[in-house]
Amino acid sequence: SGIALYGDKLENREMVKNEGFYLLDATVLSATTIEEDDLLQNIALAIKENHKKVKIWNLSLSVKIAIEEDTFSDFGVVLDHLQKTYGVLIFKSGGNGGNFMKKLPKGKLYHGSDSLLSVVVGAINDERYASNYSRVGLGPKGTIKPDLASYGGELLLGDNGEMIMKGVKSFSRNGNIASSSGTSFATARISSL
Protein backbone atom coordinates (compact mmCIF):
# COMPACT_ATOMS: atom_id res chain seq x y z
CA SER A 1 0.00 0.00 0.00
CA GLY A 2 2.98 2.32 0.52
CA ILE A 3 3.79 2.29 -3.18
CA ALA A 4 0.16 2.56 -4.25
CA LEU A 5 -0.34 5.67 -2.12
CA TYR A 6 3.13 7.25 -1.98
CA GLY A 7 5.21 5.60 -4.71
CA ASP A 8 5.88 8.76 -6.70
CA LYS A 9 6.84 10.77 -3.62
CA LEU A 10 9.13 8.02 -2.30
CA GLU A 11 10.96 7.75 -5.64
CA ASN A 12 10.95 11.54 -6.10
CA ARG A 13 9.66 11.21 -9.65
CA GLU A 14 6.28 11.12 -11.33
CA MET A 15 5.34 7.67 -12.57
CA VAL A 16 1.61 7.23 -11.94
CA LYS A 17 0.49 10.48 -10.30
CA ASN A 18 -0.62 8.86 -7.04
CA GLU A 19 -3.82 10.33 -5.68
CA GLY A 20 -5.64 9.50 -2.48
CA PHE A 21 -8.08 6.61 -2.48
CA TYR A 22 -9.92 4.29 -0.11
CA LEU A 23 -7.72 1.33 0.84
CA LEU A 24 -9.05 -1.94 2.25
CA ASP A 25 -6.59 -4.36 3.82
CA ALA A 26 -8.16 -7.74 3.10
CA THR A 27 -5.78 -10.22 4.71
CA VAL A 28 -6.07 -13.55 2.88
CA LEU A 29 -2.87 -15.24 4.07
CA SER A 30 -2.38 -16.85 7.45
CA ALA A 31 0.79 -16.46 9.48
CA THR A 32 1.81 -19.96 8.43
CA THR A 33 1.70 -21.79 5.13
CA ILE A 34 -1.61 -22.03 3.31
CA GLU A 35 -2.96 -24.46 0.74
CA GLU A 36 -4.09 -23.08 -2.63
CA ASP A 37 -7.74 -24.07 -2.02
CA ASP A 38 -7.79 -22.25 1.34
CA LEU A 39 -6.17 -19.19 -0.20
CA LEU A 40 -8.76 -19.12 -2.98
CA GLN A 41 -11.58 -19.43 -0.43
CA ASN A 42 -10.14 -16.50 1.53
CA ILE A 43 -9.85 -14.37 -1.62
CA ALA A 44 -13.41 -15.27 -2.67
CA LEU A 45 -14.79 -14.38 0.76
CA ALA A 46 -12.96 -11.03 0.85
CA ILE A 47 -14.30 -10.08 -2.59
CA LYS A 48 -17.82 -11.34 -1.84
CA GLU A 49 -17.99 -9.29 1.38
CA ASN A 50 -16.51 -6.10 -0.10
CA HIS A 51 -17.26 -6.02 -3.84
CA LYS A 52 -19.90 -3.29 -3.56
CA LYS A 53 -17.43 -0.76 -2.18
CA VAL A 54 -14.12 -2.07 -3.58
CA LYS A 55 -13.92 -2.52 -7.37
CA ILE A 56 -10.14 -2.66 -7.83
CA TRP A 57 -8.14 -5.39 -6.10
CA ASN A 58 -4.36 -5.68 -5.82
CA LEU A 59 -3.33 -9.33 -5.50
CA SER A 60 0.42 -9.24 -4.93
CA LEU A 61 0.95 -12.86 -4.02
CA SER A 62 1.47 -16.13 -5.84
CA VAL A 63 1.23 -19.85 -5.47
CA LYS A 64 4.74 -20.82 -6.51
CA ILE A 65 3.79 -23.25 -9.26
CA ALA A 66 4.56 -22.37 -12.87
CA ILE A 67 1.65 -22.05 -15.29
CA GLU A 68 1.24 -24.66 -18.02
CA GLU A 69 1.13 -24.14 -21.77
CA ASP A 70 -2.19 -25.88 -22.47
CA THR A 71 -4.15 -25.81 -19.20
CA PHE A 72 -5.39 -22.89 -17.14
CA SER A 73 -4.70 -23.14 -13.41
CA ASP A 74 -7.55 -23.44 -10.92
CA PHE A 75 -6.23 -20.22 -9.39
CA GLY A 76 -6.59 -18.35 -12.70
CA VAL A 77 -10.05 -19.82 -13.38
CA VAL A 78 -11.29 -18.79 -9.91
CA LEU A 79 -9.93 -15.25 -10.33
CA ASP A 80 -11.80 -14.95 -13.65
CA HIS A 81 -15.00 -16.30 -12.07
CA LEU A 82 -14.80 -13.82 -9.18
CA GLN A 83 -14.30 -10.89 -11.55
CA LYS A 84 -17.28 -11.90 -13.70
CA THR A 85 -19.52 -12.63 -10.71
CA TYR A 86 -18.77 -9.52 -8.67
CA GLY A 87 -17.83 -6.93 -11.31
CA VAL A 88 -14.35 -6.27 -9.94
CA LEU A 89 -10.93 -5.93 -11.55
CA ILE A 90 -7.92 -7.77 -10.11
CA PHE A 91 -4.34 -6.63 -10.65
CA LYS A 92 -2.17 -9.73 -10.17
CA SER A 93 1.61 -9.88 -9.76
CA GLY A 94 3.35 -12.20 -12.21
CA GLY A 95 5.83 -13.60 -9.71
CA ASN A 96 9.55 -13.43 -9.03
CA GLY A 97 12.29 -15.90 -9.83
CA GLY A 98 15.97 -16.34 -9.13
CA ASN A 99 17.10 -18.10 -12.30
CA PHE A 100 19.33 -15.13 -13.15
CA MET A 101 21.51 -16.06 -10.16
CA LYS A 102 22.27 -19.39 -11.91
CA LYS A 103 22.50 -17.78 -15.36
CA LEU A 104 19.39 -19.70 -16.48
CA PRO A 105 16.44 -18.43 -18.56
CA LYS A 106 13.56 -16.73 -16.75
CA GLY A 107 10.90 -18.96 -15.25
CA LYS A 108 7.27 -19.11 -16.34
CA LEU A 109 4.62 -17.02 -14.60
CA TYR A 110 3.06 -18.49 -11.46
CA HIS A 111 -0.46 -19.90 -11.02
CA GLY A 112 -3.10 -17.19 -11.12
CA SER A 113 -1.09 -15.19 -13.64
CA ASP A 114 -2.92 -17.10 -16.36
CA SER A 115 -6.20 -15.38 -15.44
CA LEU A 116 -7.64 -13.94 -18.64
CA LEU A 117 -9.54 -11.12 -16.94
CA SER A 118 -6.90 -10.06 -14.42
CA VAL A 119 -4.33 -7.44 -15.32
CA VAL A 120 -1.11 -9.39 -14.76
CA VAL A 121 1.90 -7.19 -14.01
CA GLY A 122 5.59 -7.84 -14.57
CA ALA A 123 8.47 -5.67 -13.39
CA ILE A 124 10.87 -3.41 -15.26
CA ASN A 125 14.05 -1.73 -14.08
CA ASP A 126 15.22 1.89 -14.34
CA GLU A 127 16.35 1.30 -17.93
CA ARG A 128 12.80 0.10 -18.78
CA TYR A 129 13.90 -3.45 -19.50
CA ALA A 130 12.30 -6.49 -17.89
CA SER A 131 13.79 -6.98 -14.43
CA ASN A 132 16.00 -10.06 -14.12
CA TYR A 133 13.65 -11.70 -11.61
CA SER A 134 10.36 -10.92 -13.40
CA ARG A 135 8.73 -14.15 -14.60
CA VAL A 136 7.49 -14.47 -18.20
CA GLY A 137 4.63 -15.84 -20.32
CA LEU A 138 3.14 -16.87 -22.64
CA GLY A 139 0.02 -17.99 -20.84
CA PRO A 140 -1.92 -21.15 -21.73
CA LYS A 141 -3.09 -21.46 -25.33
CA GLY A 142 -0.70 -18.68 -26.40
CA THR A 143 -2.37 -15.94 -24.35
CA ILE A 144 -0.25 -12.84 -23.85
CA LYS A 145 0.83 -12.47 -20.23
CA PRO A 146 1.91 -10.41 -18.39
CA ASP A 147 -0.37 -7.64 -19.60
CA LEU A 148 1.67 -4.70 -18.31
CA ALA A 149 4.95 -3.96 -16.59
CA SER A 150 5.97 -1.21 -14.22
CA TYR A 151 8.98 -0.20 -12.18
CA GLY A 152 9.71 -2.89 -9.60
CA GLY A 153 13.42 -2.43 -9.01
CA GLU A 154 16.16 -4.82 -10.07
CA LEU A 155 18.20 -7.72 -8.75
CA LEU A 156 21.62 -8.35 -10.26
CA LEU A 157 24.26 -11.05 -10.09
CA GLY A 158 27.43 -9.51 -8.69
CA ASP A 159 30.97 -10.34 -9.80
CA ASN A 160 31.47 -12.56 -6.74
CA GLY A 161 28.15 -14.39 -7.15
CA GLU A 162 26.30 -12.19 -4.65
CA MET A 163 22.87 -10.72 -5.28
CA ILE A 164 22.79 -6.94 -5.69
CA MET A 165 19.49 -5.14 -5.19
CA LYS A 166 18.45 -1.84 -6.71
CA GLY A 167 15.17 -1.58 -4.85
CA VAL A 168 11.92 0.30 -4.93
CA LYS A 169 11.28 2.59 -1.98
CA SER A 170 8.34 1.86 0.28
CA PHE A 171 7.69 1.57 4.00
CA SER A 172 8.91 -1.13 6.37
CA ARG A 173 6.55 -2.68 8.93
CA ASN A 174 7.73 -0.13 11.51
CA GLY A 175 7.07 2.81 9.17
CA ASN A 176 10.62 3.58 8.06
CA ILE A 177 11.52 4.05 4.40
CA ALA A 178 13.00 0.81 3.06
CA SER A 179 13.65 -0.70 -0.34
CA SER A 180 13.09 -4.04 -2.00
CA SER A 181 12.37 -5.43 -5.46
CA GLY A 182 9.58 -7.50 -6.95
CA THR A 183 6.56 -7.75 -9.19
CA SER A 184 4.40 -7.06 -6.12
CA PHE A 185 5.77 -3.52 -6.02
CA ALA A 186 5.14 -3.04 -9.74
CA THR A 187 1.58 -4.36 -9.28
CA ALA A 188 0.83 -1.96 -6.42
CA ARG A 189 2.04 0.92 -8.58
CA ILE A 190 -0.15 -0.07 -11.55
CA SER A 191 -3.24 -0.79 -9.42
CA SER A 192 -3.08 2.76 -8.06
CA LEU A 193 -3.78 4.20 -11.51
Segment roles from a protein language model:
Residues 5-9, 150, 191-193:
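Short glycine/serine- and small hydrophobic-enriched flexible loop segments
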Residues 28-115, 174-187:
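Substrate-binding/access-modulating region of protease and related hydrolase catalytic domains
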Residues 1-36, 87, 114-117, 139-145, ...:
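Subtilisin-like serine protease catalytic core
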Residues 108-191:
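Extracellular S/T/G-rich loop segment that most often corresponds to the catalytic His/Ser-adjacent loop
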Residues 25-28, 59, 123, 150:
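Hydrophobic side chains in beta-strands
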